[in-house]
Design a protein with these regions (language model features):
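N-terminal "arm"/small-domain region of PLP-dependent enzymes with the aminotransferase-like
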Residues: 1-60, 64-67
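Short, intrinsically disordered, charge-balanced linker/junction segments flanking boundaries
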Residues: 1-4, 151, 260-264
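Short, solvent-exposed loop/turn segments at secondary-structure junctions
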Residues: 22-26, 93, 117, 164-166, ...
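Alpha-helix N-cap/helix-start motif at coil-to-helix transitions, marked by capping-box chemistry
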Residues: 32, 56-59, 63, 118, ...
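Conserved core of the PLP fold type I
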Residues: 43, 48-189, 193, 199-218
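Conserved core segment of the aminotransferase class I/II
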Residues: 213-264
């Protein structure tokens, strides 16, 4: 089972205030706005919201996400993305699970930060890969150590990182380390899973360019979520991938839950 399961079960106890589960404060949930939107959806297209939909997700939402990412990241160097390269997933945890199913066989290798996110390790572990930790300091993975491991490790399928407010350390990768990582990924043509659940939670300082804005070969699989900025109970997140990867992920997504609930 998931190592996060017991942590989340504890949070249901009324006398527990948990700092372990990554739960947003309920006071921040936009309940009134969500109620208004739910009424509007029911009035305008209630039947459509309750019907089966495409496995990649509702096109209107994908277009909105693409427009927002283009507005934020094209000025930082990202190649403009299209809605057709976005898949809506049932929480970013499903994106992790689908990525593991697409990329990993037993004894394949995932390069991870040291330490790394427990939920990602749990999702990938279902495919029985090997996890190789890359020495990491307060600025991110150490490039020399990463290249050394790339050169000496067989069957590396992808690199998994959380550049913004990393879980569990909380570090934010420096711009230079992000560039170095993408230079190495490009040089050795290794896919990179950029997990960005916390990027919108910056309280001070300038936003640092994401890895997807430094990706000339479209190797980055970008994961974003509404769990920290809207409400985790909606189980609403997305992934941005190149055409080939997204086609494979679409097959897996359709075979597991058909599609993320249209009503959300």
């Amino acid at each position: 089972g998931s190592d996060l399961g017991p942590l989340l079960a504890l949070t249901a106890q009324p006398d527990i205030i948990s700092f372990a589960g990554g739960l947003p404060a309920p006071i921040t949930f936009p309940l009134k706005e969500l109620e208004e939107v739910a009424v509007k959806v029911r009035q305008e297209d209630g039947a459509g919201a309750m019907q089966y939909g495409p496995s990649l997700g509702f096109m209107g939402l994908r277009e909105t996400i693409a427009a927002r990412m283009n507005r934020m990241y094209v000025p930082m160097g990202m190649t403009e993305i299209s809605a057709k390269n976005i898949m809506i997933v049932t929480g970013s945890q499903q994106g992790l699970d689908i990525t593991g199913r697409v990329f990993l066989d037993k004894d394949d290798v995932v390069l991870i930060e040291s330490p790394s996110y427990l939920g990602a390790i749990g999702a990938f572990a279902l495919e029985q890969p090997k996890f190789v930790e890359v020495p990491t300091d307060g600025e991110g993975m150490i490039p020399e150590e990463l290249e050394k491991l790339i050169q000496t490790t067989e069957r590396v399928k992808f690199i998994y990182v959380i550049p913004n407010y990393q879980n569990p350390t909380g570090i934010c990768w420096s711009l230079e380390r992000r560039r170095k990582l993408m230079e190495l990924a490009t040089k050795y043509e290794i896919p990179v899973f950029e997990d960005n659940p916390y990027g919108d939670l910056r309280f001070e300082g300038e936003e640092i360019a994401p890895l997807i804005s430094m990706d000339p070969k479209h190797l980055v699989m970008y994961s974003g979520t509404f769990s920290k900025t809207l409400a985790p109970g909606m189980r609403l997140a997305w992934m941005v991938c190149n055409d080939d990867i997204l086609a494979k992920m679409d097959l897996v997504k359709g075979s597991t839950d058909l599609h993320t609930p249209s009503v959300t």
